[in-house]
C-alpha cells in the first residue's frame, strides 16, 4: 500500500516507516518527507538537517520537499507518478533531482504533502554526497549555490518542468517570466519572494545570486 525511497548508505531508525505511515493517515496526505540527521563520516558527528519549514504556495517550483531517502508515499500517487515517469525524458537535464521531481509532481497535482519535523534517518555525508553538504549555511554552500545559479541549473529544470503545467496557471506564468530576460526573471523572483522557497535564508541567497546572473 505504500512505497519508500531508500539510499543504500543511509541508516533508518527502527520507527521510521511506522511513524511515516501514521502521519500519512493522520494528515490524510499522499507524500511524507522529513528532517534528517546528518552523519558526517569524516569526523563521526551528527547534526540536524531541517526541512520542515512551512510549505509555501509556490515552493515546489524551485525546490524539493526533502532528501528523497525520507520520502514515503501512497499507492495512489505512486501509480500516477509511474505513468508520468514513463513519458519523462531526462536526457537534457543538468543534475537531475528526483527529490525535486517527486515533490513537484505531488504539489502540482494537488496531492497533500506532509513534512515531518522529526528525523528517523542518519543521512550519511561523504565526498560523493554533494547535496547533503549544501544545506548548511557556509562559504562552501554559497560557492556551490553560486555555481548552480550562474551555470543555469534552475533554468534547465524550469525549462523541463514548465511543459507539465497549465498555461493559464500562476505557476506557468512564474516559470515563463523566470525563463525571460534578466529583468523579467528578477522581477518575478522579488514579486513572489519567500513564496518561492520555504527557508527564507535559502531564498535570499537564491535571489541575490540571480541579481548577479546576467
Feature locations, PLM:
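Nucleotide-sugar donor-binding/catalytic module of glycosyltransferases
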Residues: 1-136
Amino acid at each position: 500500500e505504500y512505497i519508500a525511497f531508500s539510499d543504500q548508505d543511509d541508516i533508518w531508525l527502527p520507527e521510521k516507516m511506522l511513524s511515516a505511515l501514521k502521519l500519512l493517515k493522520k494528515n490524510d496526505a499522499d507524500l511524507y518527507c522529513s528532517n534528517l540527521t546528518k552523519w558526517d563520516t569524516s569526523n563521526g558527528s551528527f547534526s540536524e538537517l531541517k526541512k520542515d519549514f512551512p510549505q509555501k504556495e509556490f515552493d515546489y517550483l524551485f525546490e524539493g520537499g526533502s532528501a528523497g531517502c525520507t520520502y514515503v508515499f501512497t499507492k495512489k500517487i505512486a501509480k500516477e507518478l509511474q505513468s508520468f515517469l514513463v513519458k519523462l525524458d531526462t536526457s537534457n537535464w543538468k543534475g537531475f533531482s528526483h527529490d525535486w521531481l517527486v515533490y513537484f509532481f505531488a504539489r502540482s497535482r494537488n496531492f497533500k504533502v506532509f513534512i515531518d519535523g522529526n528525523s528517523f534517518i542518519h543521512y550519511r555525508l561523504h565526498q560523493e554526497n554533494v547535496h547533503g553538504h549544501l544545506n548548511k549555511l557556509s562559504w562552501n554552500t554559497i560557492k556551490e549555490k553560486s555555481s548552480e545559479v550562474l551555470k543555469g541549473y534552475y533554468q534547465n529544470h524550469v525549462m523541463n518542468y514548465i511543459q507539465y503545467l497549465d498555461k493559464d496557471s500562476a505557476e506557468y506564468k512564474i516559470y515563463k517570466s523566470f525563463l525571460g530576460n534578466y529583468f523579467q526573471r528578477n522581477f518575478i523572483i522579488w514579486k513572489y519572494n519567500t513564496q518561492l522557497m520555504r527557508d527564507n535564508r535559502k531564498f535570499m541567497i537564491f535571489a541575490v545570486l540571480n541579481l548577479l546572473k546576467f
